[in-house]
Protein backbone atom coordinates (compact mmCIF):
# COMPACT_ATOMS: atom_id res chain seq x y z
CA UNK A 1 0.00 0.00 0.00
CA UNK A 2 1.52 3.29 -1.10
CA UNK A 3 4.87 1.57 -1.66
CA UNK A 4 4.86 -0.22 1.71
CA UNK A 5 4.55 -3.90 2.43
CA UNK A 6 1.71 -4.94 4.69
CA UNK A 7 1.57 -8.34 6.33
CA UNK A 8 -1.51 -9.53 8.17
CA UNK A 9 -1.26 -12.50 10.52
CA UNK A 10 -3.47 -14.03 13.18
CA UNK A 11 -2.03 -13.94 16.69
CA UNK A 12 -4.35 -15.72 19.11
CA UNK A 13 -4.65 -14.08 22.49
CA UNK A 14 -2.95 -15.82 25.37
CA UNK A 15 -2.48 -15.46 29.07
CA UNK A 16 0.41 -13.74 30.81
CA UNK A 17 1.96 -17.07 31.76
CA UNK A 18 4.66 -15.68 34.06
CA UNK A 19 2.20 -13.47 35.93
CA UNK A 20 -0.42 -16.21 36.25
CA UNK A 21 2.01 -18.89 37.41
CA UNK A 22 3.49 -16.42 39.92
CA UNK A 23 0.03 -16.49 41.52
CA UNK A 24 0.61 -20.19 42.20
CA UNK A 25 3.58 -19.38 44.42
CA UNK A 26 1.50 -17.26 46.77
CA UNK A 27 0.21 -18.39 50.12
CA UNK A 28 -3.31 -17.59 48.95
CA UNK A 29 -3.05 -20.11 46.08
CA UNK A 30 -1.54 -22.83 48.28
CA UNK A 31 -4.16 -22.28 50.98
CA UNK A 32 -6.98 -22.41 48.43
CA UNK A 33 -5.66 -25.67 46.98
CA UNK A 34 -5.33 -27.19 50.45
CA UNK A 35 -8.81 -26.05 51.51
CA UNK A 36 -10.30 -27.51 48.34
CA UNK A 37 -8.50 -30.83 48.72
CA UNK A 38 -9.62 -31.00 52.32
CA UNK A 39 -13.23 -30.02 51.62
CA UNK A 40 -13.61 -32.46 48.73
CA UNK A 41 -12.27 -35.25 50.95
CA UNK A 42 -9.93 -36.33 48.22
CA UNK A 43 -12.77 -36.97 45.77
CA UNK A 44 -11.96 -36.18 42.15
CA UNK A 45 -12.80 -32.53 41.67
CA UNK A 46 -13.99 -31.14 38.34
CA UNK A 47 -14.12 -27.37 37.87
CA UNK A 48 -15.72 -24.91 35.50
CA UNK A 49 -15.00 -21.20 35.75
CA UNK A 50 -17.04 -18.97 33.47
CA UNK A 51 -18.64 -15.58 33.78
CA UNK A 52 -22.40 -15.84 34.00
CA UNK A 53 -23.25 -15.59 30.30
CA UNK A 54 -25.62 -17.46 27.98
CA UNK A 55 -22.81 -18.22 25.48
CA UNK A 56 -20.95 -20.31 28.05
CA UNK A 57 -23.45 -23.17 27.96
CA UNK A 58 -23.77 -23.38 31.74
CA UNK A 59 -27.33 -24.80 31.87
CA UNK A 60 -26.31 -27.43 29.32
CA UNK A 61 -23.20 -28.20 31.37
CA UNK A 62 -25.27 -28.82 34.49
CA UNK A 63 -27.64 -30.98 32.43
CA UNK A 64 -24.62 -33.05 31.41
CA UNK A 65 -23.46 -33.39 35.01
CA UNK A 66 -26.98 -34.45 35.98
CA UNK A 67 -27.09 -37.10 33.24
CA UNK A 68 -23.67 -38.38 34.30
CA UNK A 69 -24.82 -38.90 37.90
CA UNK A 70 -28.09 -40.49 36.73
CA UNK A 71 -26.21 -42.96 34.52
CA UNK A 72 -23.38 -43.54 37.01
CA UNK A 73 -24.85 -43.26 40.52
CA UNK A 74 -21.80 -45.08 41.88
CA UNK A 75 -19.67 -42.07 40.89
CA UNK A 76 -21.55 -39.60 43.12
CA UNK A 77 -19.22 -40.49 45.99
CA UNK A 78 -16.13 -40.16 43.77
CA UNK A 79 -16.71 -36.86 41.95
CA UNK A 80 -17.53 -33.31 42.95
CA UNK A 81 -18.30 -30.65 40.34
CA UNK A 82 -17.49 -27.04 41.20
CA UNK A 83 -18.95 -24.32 38.97
CA UNK A 84 -17.69 -20.81 39.61
CA UNK A 85 -19.82 -18.31 37.69
CA UNK A 86 -19.19 -14.70 38.71
CA UNK A 87 -22.16 -12.47 37.95
CA UNK A 88 -22.10 -10.27 34.88
CA UNK A 89 -24.64 -7.81 33.55
CA UNK A 90 -26.79 -8.23 36.64
CA UNK A 91 -29.17 -5.49 35.50
CA UNK A 92 -30.26 -7.46 32.40
CA UNK A 93 -33.27 -9.77 32.80
CA UNK A 94 -31.89 -12.61 30.67
CA UNK A 95 -28.78 -12.82 32.87
CA UNK A 96 -30.93 -12.87 36.01
CA UNK A 97 -32.89 -15.73 34.44
CA UNK A 98 -29.69 -17.68 33.72
CA UNK A 99 -28.58 -17.26 37.32
CA UNK A 100 -31.96 -18.47 38.62
CA UNK A 101 -31.88 -21.42 36.21
CA UNK A 102 -28.37 -22.44 37.32
CA UNK A 103 -29.35 -22.21 40.97
CA UNK A 104 -32.41 -24.35 40.24
CA UNK A 105 -30.45 -26.98 38.28
CA UNK A 106 -27.68 -27.20 40.87
CA UNK A 107 -30.33 -27.57 43.58
CA UNK A 108 -32.11 -30.32 41.64
CA UNK A 109 -28.88 -32.28 41.15
CA UNK A 110 -27.96 -31.92 44.80
CA UNK A 111 -31.50 -32.80 45.88
CA UNK A 112 -31.40 -35.99 43.84
CA UNK A 113 -27.84 -37.11 44.61
CA UNK A 114 -26.70 -35.61 47.94
CA UNK A 115 -26.33 -37.56 51.12
CA UNK A 116 -25.77 -36.44 54.67
CA UNK A 117 -22.02 -36.27 54.13
CA UNK A 118 -21.63 -35.00 50.56
CA UNK A 119 -22.96 -32.61 47.96
CA UNK A 120 -22.02 -33.44 44.34
CA UNK A 121 -22.36 -29.93 42.87
CA UNK A 122 -21.03 -26.68 44.26
CA UNK A 123 -22.35 -23.64 42.44
CA UNK A 124 -20.54 -20.43 43.35
CA UNK A 125 -21.89 -17.12 42.02
CA UNK A 126 -18.92 -14.96 43.07
CA UNK A 127 -15.67 -13.77 41.60
CA UNK A 128 -12.31 -14.92 42.95
CA UNK A 129 -8.78 -13.58 42.81
CA UNK A 130 -6.30 -14.99 40.28
CA UNK A 131 -4.40 -16.66 43.14
CA UNK A 132 -7.56 -18.37 44.40
CA UNK A 133 -8.40 -19.56 40.88
CA UNK A 134 -4.86 -20.89 40.46
CA UNK A 135 -5.23 -22.86 43.69
CA UNK A 136 -8.64 -24.15 42.63
CA UNK A 137 -7.33 -25.24 39.22
CA UNK A 138 -4.38 -26.96 40.85
CA UNK A 139 -6.65 -28.91 43.23
CA UNK A 140 -9.03 -30.06 40.48
CA UNK A 141 -8.10 -33.05 38.34
CA UNK A 142 -10.61 -32.13 35.62
CA UNK A 143 -11.15 -28.74 34.00
CA UNK A 144 -14.41 -28.32 32.11
CA UNK A 145 -14.62 -25.56 29.48
CA UNK A 146 -17.67 -26.19 27.30
CA UNK A 147 -19.07 -22.99 25.79
CA UNK A 148 -21.70 -23.23 23.09
CA UNK A 149 -19.60 -20.84 21.02
CA UNK A 150 -16.66 -18.80 22.23
CA UNK A 151 -13.63 -16.89 21.12
CA UNK A 152 -10.27 -17.60 22.68
CA UNK A 153 -11.27 -18.96 26.08
CA UNK A 154 -8.48 -17.99 28.46
CA UNK A 155 -9.83 -20.10 31.34
CA UNK A 156 -8.77 -23.20 29.40
CA UNK A 157 -5.23 -21.86 29.16
CA UNK A 158 -5.20 -20.86 32.84
CA UNK A 159 -6.33 -24.34 33.87
CA UNK A 160 -3.49 -25.92 31.88
CA UNK A 161 -0.94 -23.40 33.22
CA UNK A 162 -1.90 -24.22 36.82
CA UNK A 163 -1.35 -27.96 36.48
CA UNK A 164 1.49 -29.82 38.17
CA UNK A 165 3.63 -31.18 35.30
CA UNK A 166 4.34 -34.32 37.35
CA UNK A 167 0.62 -35.04 37.85
CA UNK A 168 -1.48 -32.91 35.51
CA UNK A 169 -5.24 -32.92 35.33
CA UNK A 170 -7.24 -33.29 32.14
CA UNK A 171 -8.93 -30.45 30.27
CA UNK A 172 -12.31 -31.25 28.71
CA UNK A 173 -12.79 -28.56 26.08
CA UNK A 174 -15.58 -27.74 23.66
CA UNK A 175 -14.48 -27.88 20.07
CA UNK A 176 -16.46 -24.61 19.73
CA UNK A 177 -14.01 -22.72 21.96
CA UNK A 178 -11.28 -20.85 20.12
CA UNK A 179 -8.71 -22.38 22.47
CA UNK A 180 -9.45 -25.82 20.94
CA UNK A 181 -7.30 -24.83 17.95
CA UNK A 182 -4.25 -24.47 20.19
CA UNK A 183 -4.77 -26.92 23.05
CA UNK A 184 -4.37 -30.15 21.10
CA UNK A 185 -3.84 -32.23 24.25
CA UNK A 186 -7.31 -31.43 25.57
CA UNK A 187 -10.17 -33.89 25.38
CA UNK A 188 -12.37 -32.20 22.77
CA UNK A 189 -16.14 -32.59 23.04
CA UNK A 190 -19.14 -31.37 21.08
What are these regions (language model features)?
Residues 70-82, 138-190:
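Catalytic binding pocket for nucleotide-activated donors in carbohydrate/polymer assembly enzymes
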Residues 128-141:
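Short acidic alpha-helix that forms the nucleotide-activated donor recognition element
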